[in-house]
């Protein structure tokens, strides 16, 4: 069936129903309407497919086209994520500001990584090497404090048949070719894509045997947090939950911080961005942003993107975890994420 065969059947806030066949699968990414708004399939029932749209749906009407992308909702991973700020579906907000001004325009399909910036790449493999999932094939300095390690993707193993020369490359230029046991040749670059709702595989979960030093003596003494563990900060409005998370993000001894503002107030994310840019990391004496990724999905942004932003942050955090770094993921707040889930559930007419 051709792509034009899918059309909008109905619109209910961020939820759009689609007709035209049975070719769409759960979690498939689609572009909705004339402006090609980004959406994701959340229900398939008979000949009717339900899509949640991550942008404002004002102006959509029945009969407009829906274009399937043929892949699940994914984000781009590679050098350039650190020292950057993204929205809930991993679009860089600084590039969005250049293209559309202070307000986010609809239908902006912007890649997460800069296509023109070059990185000084050193190859870690040579022709004839046998490689498997998780093996390092290249590395480059991403910031002044973090070296980016490019790893063989999950599910790929084989023999290296070609490597590029060490030098400067963009995220789209091939670095290594690997031939698998079936004879297929895979070209590996600095960047790769990963579905946000698929956990990155791991061999085993290591036991928690060392503390995360948060820099807050009362937490480290009375409520210690283990590296590899989790902690929650419950409390009423105005109790200082966000300020506590800011302190943990600034001074904890993690290698990388992924700070996720899920439905937070815009001024709180602005404060975090300003402070992280000015403060120095006590270990490296470099700005804190050199080891930080900010994901800003504030309360005035579409509610569907708020739901996806948590998975975006987890995918980025797991990506750097696989490189061997200690990564601290701060999600603020879980209650507003649950609020987004409740609203989506209501739009889907679920109990």
Question: Model-predicted segments: where are they?
Answer:
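The Walker A (P-loop) glycine that initiates the GxxxxGKT/S ATP-binding motif of P-loop NTPases
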Residues: 235-236
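Conserved P-loop NTPase nucleotide-binding/switch module
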Residues: 239-256, 261-262, 266-268, 275-276, ...
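Conserved "cap/hinge" positions at secondary-structure junctions
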Residues: 20, 34, 69-70, 89, ...
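Short, compositionally biased
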Residues: 42-49, 79-90, 146-167, 187-200
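Short histidine-centered loop motifs in beta-beta connectors
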Residues: 53, 58, 120-130, 160-168
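Short coil/turn connectors at secondary-structure junctions
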Residues: 82, 191, 227-230, 252-257, ...
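N-terminal accessory targeting/assembly segments
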Residues: 1-97, 101-105
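P-loop NTPase nucleotide-binding/switch module
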Residues: 98-135, 139-154, 170-230, 244-247, ...
């Amino acid at each position: 069936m051709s792509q034009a065969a899918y059309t909008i059947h109905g619109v209910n806030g961020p939820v759009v129903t689609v007709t035209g066949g049975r070719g769409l699968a759960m979690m498939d990414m689609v572009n909705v309407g004339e402006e090609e708004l980004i959406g994701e399939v959340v229900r398939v029932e008979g000949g009717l497919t339900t899509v949640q749209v991550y942008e404002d749906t004002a102006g959509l009407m029945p009969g407009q086209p829906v274009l399937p992308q043929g892949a699940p909702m994914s984000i781009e991973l590679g050098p350039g994520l650190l020292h950057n700020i993204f929205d809930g579906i991993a679009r860089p907000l600084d590039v969005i500001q250049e293209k559309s001004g202070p307000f986010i325009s609809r239908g902006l399909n912007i890649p997460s990584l800069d296509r023109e910036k070059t990185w000084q790449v050193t190859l870690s493999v040579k022709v004839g090497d046998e490689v498997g999932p998780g093996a390092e094939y290249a590395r480059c300095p991403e910031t002044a404090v973090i070296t980016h390690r490019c790893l063989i993707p999950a599910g790929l193993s084989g023999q290296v048949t070609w490597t590029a020369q060490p030098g400067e490359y963009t995220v789209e230029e091939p670095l290594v070719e690997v031939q698998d046991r079936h004879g297929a040749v895979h070209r590996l670059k600095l960047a790769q894509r990963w579905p946000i709702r698929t956990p990155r595989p791991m061999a085993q979960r290591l036991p928690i045997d060392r503390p995360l030093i948060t820099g807050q003596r009362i937490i480290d003494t009375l409520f210690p947090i283990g590296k590899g563990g989790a902690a929650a900060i419950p409390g009423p409005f105005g109790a200082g939950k966000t300020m506590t998370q800011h302190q943990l993000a600034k001074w904890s001894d993690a290698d990388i911080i992924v700070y996720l503002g899920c439905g937070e107030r815009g001024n709180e994310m602005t404060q975090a961005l300003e402070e992280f840019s000015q403060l120095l990391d006590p270990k490296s004496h470099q700005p804190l942003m050199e080891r930080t990724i900010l994901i800003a999905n504030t309360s005035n942004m579409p509610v569907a993107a708020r739901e996806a932003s948590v998975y975006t942050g987890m995918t980025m955090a797991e990506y750097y975890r696989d490189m061997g770094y200690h990564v601290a993921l701060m999600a603020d707040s879980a209650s507003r994420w649950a609020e987004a889930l409740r609203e989506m559930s209501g739009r889907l007419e679920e109990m």
